[in-house]
Amino acid sequence: MGAMELEENTVQIRDDFDPDKILESGQCFRPRKQVEGWYRFVSGRQLLYLRPLRSGTYTVRCEPGAWETFWHGYFDLGRSYAALRGKLDSRDDFLQRAMEYGRGIRVLRQDEWEMLVSFIISQRKSIPAIRRAVELLSERFGERLGSDSEGPVYAFPTAEALCCAGEQALQECGLGYRTRYVLHAAQQAAEGTLDLKKLASLPDEALFARLMELDGVGKKVANCVCLFGYGRVGRVPVDVWIERLIRDEFAGQDPFPQFGLEAGIVQQYLFFYKRSVG
């Protein structure tokens, strides 16, 4: 598979898990489906290949020990999504349909820096356009991790790498007006005035407030970073799809406060369903 030493193992996942739905759930932009049923996930410097064998059984290729120490947390496998669906499925017919339709989605715990840059880029962009921009950044400025049937595989670029790249090079990756926001965040992260790892110790509201201080970060982007980068599953990003859902399905009344610390997971079911079936 290239430069990284990858070890192949068979693992069991007994809870809801559907890689196709995860890839299409709008929370991740680099994972992809490959030939012969393989899925590739890249997060930080970690690389995973996963292929379903039979119900609940998967072949995985990753660095030795990384399935237990990294990918188990990345896929939030310590939480029972089946139990969550069972607890909530009688509250609302629309919610019940959405959870059944989205069964297999999981909220990924992704790299904080990658999530910050990706969701700054995401503003007023389609998901395919976000994927192209994020992949171009990785190919041009990220560290090469290895290669597979599709060619070289790269890590997402560090803040230092983006600073060195400069404005023109980032513009060429399709960032548009978002370039200056990404560069400003990269400069702060490279200088140490923005330490995303340290922010993990903050409570939800303080974390959200600190992210909101960054140029180009509004409520939606800050909540996306909280949810998908820090695992704060009570946070609810509100985009045009969620706005429509609240208007059309809940008579304009925000349904998410009733779901408390699991509202962000419910949001993923509803977002996926609304975006898929309208």
Protein language model regions, located:
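HhH-family (HhH-GPD) DNA N-glycosylase catalytic core used in base-excision repair
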Residues: 1-278
